Amino acid sequence: MPSIIVFDFDGVIVDSNEVRMNGFIRLYQNRYPWAIDEYRRYLRLNSGLSRYKKIEYFYENILRIEPELMILTKDAEDYSSIVTSDVIKAPFIDGSIDFIKKNINRFEYAMISSSNQLELIKICMSRDIDKYFTEILGSPIEKNKNIERFIRNKNAIKSEIVYVGDTKYDEIAALNSGISFIGFGQKSEFSQTEKVVNTYAELEKILH
C-alpha cells in the first residue's frame, strides 16, 4: 500500500491537455501555417513531453532548421504567456479534488509534471491547490530526474510511492525511477502496466 501519491497535472488533476496543445498551435499558426497540420499530429501523440522538446521538434523535424537557444527560450516564454490564464480557468478532472481532500490524511501528495515548474506553481497557487502538495516539480528538469530528486529529498522508500499519470512518458519516467505507476485514461496509451483507471472512483478502489 503506497503512502505517497505523485500526480501528473495536465489530464490528471486538471482537464487542460487541449489547452496546452492549442497553445502550441497558436504560437506558430501565423508564422508557419503550412506546418500546423503535421505539428498537430505530433502534439497529439506526444502530450507528455515538455514544451522545450516540443518546440525543438518543431524547428528541427518540421521546419528542418537548427534554432538558436535564444529563439527556443523566447518561444517557451511566449507559449507560457499564451496558455497560463487558460490553464488556470480549465476545469478540474471530475473527482480529482474530492479525492485529494478525502484522502489527505491517508497519503502524502506531490506533483511532478512536464510543465514549466515556475508556471505550474503559479497555476496551482491561483487555483488554491498548492497547499495539498508537499512538492511541485516541473521542467526544464526532466520528469525522471525530478522523481529521483523527490525520492532523495524525502529519503522516501520507493515501494511506498505510486505515480499517477496519463501518458506513456509518465509511465516510462516512473518505472525507470523504480516506483509504481497507475495509468489514468486509455489503456492503449500504456504498454508496461496493467493498472489503468478512468475515474477517481476507480483509483480509490485500486488503492484500497
Question: What are these language model-derived features?
Answer:
Residues 1-3, 117, 123-208:
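Asp-based, Mg2+/Mn2+-dependent phosphohydrolase catalytic module
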Residues 30-35, 63-67, 128-132, 155-156:
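Short helix-capping segments at alpha-helix termini
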Residues 19, 50, 91, 95, ...:
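Short beta->alpha linker loops
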Residues 59-95, 107:
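Metal-dependent phosphoesterase signature
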Residues 44-46:
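A short helix-loop-helix "switch/interaction" segment in the helical subdomain of ASCE P-loop NTPases
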Residues 12, 24, 96-124, 137-139:
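Substrate-recognition element of Asp-dependent hydrolases with the DxDx(T/V) motif
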Residues 1-41:
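Active-site neighborhood of HAD-like aspartate-dependent phosphohydrolases
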Residues 25-29, 50-67:
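Helix-loop "lid/cap" segments that line or gate small-molecule binding pockets
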